[in-house]
Amino acid sequence: MNVVVDTHTHTLASGHAYSTIIENAQSAQNKGLKLLCTTDHAPEMPGAPHYWYFNNQRILPRFLHQVGILRGVEANILNVKGEIDLPFSSDQHLDWVIASFHEPVFAPASEAEHTAALLNVIKSGRIDVLGHSGNPNYPFDIERVLQCAKEYNVAIEVNNTSLTGKSRKGSDVRCDKIVEIGKEIGVYFTTGSDAHFCEEIARLDLAIALLEKYEIAEDKIITTSTSRFLNFLLLRGKLAIPEFERLY
């Protein structure tokens, strides 16, 4: 499987990552990526930037080191209502919005509460993908949430860092189940390194192996071509990005 997009990456701006966007783009080019989503942590995460940072991504060039740059965020799910920590005015400036649970922002609660939060954030229409949903601290009704994700064309991330055992320990078992059920339901999958250092960009080996284990069709993995990824954004109701015309 050839993956040409990394949809989950962090820069210095996240507060606990160690590279600039230029360093990340250089690494992406060196590793053969065509598109890179830059997705720093949203404001409620300790150390994260103000929402102006995300709005101001409009000043970023569309290409750095010949790699297309998608302006994104890893937003925090705040509550069971499915609210996220950016104002609605930020939405127009963002190409790619991940929604994730993080312990400092949403304390682990019951399976019912996690499920409600995920269903509501999907239905909000503000997010494009659920991030590292295999975290065992946040059990949820996998079938209900993935059915909802399919209905609303929200992708499910296979997070490589979650599969290493170094972060969110125990995620591998739940990630396996999520991919298995996701195949049956027919959700869209995406692959994210969750890189917090430039050398981790495009480190997707474990995510790819899991998708291959369940023989997920490439047309359901939106990172296997620039066309699949960008057309998924159109499916989500996003406007076409003129600078990427040749990549559709």
From Swiss-Prot:
UniProt EC number: 3.1.3.-
Metal-binding keyword on record: yes
Gene3D superfamilies according to UniProt: Metal-dependent hydrolases
Record InterPro entries: Phosphatase_YcdX_put, PHP_dom, PHP_phosphatase, Pol/His_phosphatase_N, Pol/histidinol_Pase-like
Residue sites binding Zn(2+) 2 per the record: H16, H41, H196
UniProt entry keywords in alphabetical sequence: Hydrolase, Metal-binding, Zinc
One term of GO molecular function: zinc ion binding
GO CC field: cytosol
Keyword Lyase among record annotations: no
Binding site for Zn(2+) 3: E74, H102, H132
CDD domains: PHP_HisPPase_Ycdx_like
Biological process annotations from GO: bacterial-type flagellum-dependent swarming motility
Pfam family, one: PHP
Residues annotated to bind Zn(2+) 1: H8, H10, E74, D194
Cofactors required: Zn(2+)
Cofactor: how bound: Binds 3 Zn(2+) ions per subunit.
HAMAP family: YcdX_phosphat
Family named by the database record: Belongs to the PHP family.
Protein name, entry field: Probable phosphatase VFMJ11_A0091
